[in-house]
Regions:
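Loop-helix junctions at membrane interfaces
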Residues: 1-175
Length: 175
């Protein structure tokens, strides 16, 4: 059974990585060029809340690797997104999957990522944070909804999986 659970975990991480990667290609526009906000932020928060830190970080690493391979991200993008993920995971670690987590982990992660970005590029930190405020509000408003949707999807998959498991001694064990 270990092989089945490993294969299931690999598939789950791969699918979540694809979800992060594809949603990162959609961005909320910004007044300043280059300051767009990725739609993947609330989805990433939801993945952490529903699937836990380990799965979230692994899916994020795979997503970043895919972005590098496709050329849609560079090392700076990957570093900033990893900082966002670490901040979200830290909030999850200390608060769990509650309302506070879904409301504030995304904006906290974005805040720390923008502060780090300002240190790297040498621009005013508060200007970068101010440019991200619309995206932070978007994440604050939508992460809980994304978490509900992912939670319902996970629950349906688990119920389907449990319903399809039959015991060898059970009568009418036909598939």
């Amino acid at each position: 059974m270990q092989t089945r659970s490993t294969a299931k975990a690999l598939c789950q991480i791969g699918l979540l990585a694809v979800l992060i990667t594809v949603s990162a290609m959609f961005k909320l526009p910004s007044i300043l060029p280059g300051m767009e906000f990725q739609i993947s932020a609330p989805i990433a928060v939801a993945i952490c809340g529903v699937f836990g830190i380990r799965t979230y970080i692994l899916a994020g690493l795979v997503s970043s690797a895919v972005g590098l391979l496709l050329g849609t991200q560079n090392i700076l993008n990957v570093g900033i997104s990893l900082l966002f993920r670490i901040a979200v995971a830290a909030v999850f670690f200390f608060s769990g999957p509650n309302r506070f987590f879904y409301l504030f982990s995304g904006p906290i992660g974005t805040f720390f990522a923008r502060i780090a970005l300002s240190a790297v590029v040498g621009k005013a930190a508060w200007g970068l944070v101010a440019a991200a405020v619309p995206g932070m509000v978007f994440t604050l408003l939508t992460a809980g909804f994304c978490g509900k949707v992912l939670g319902l999807a996970r629950k349906a998959v688990l119920e389907r999986e449990n319903a399809s498991v039959r015991h060898p001694l059970q009568e009418n064990n036909v598939r």
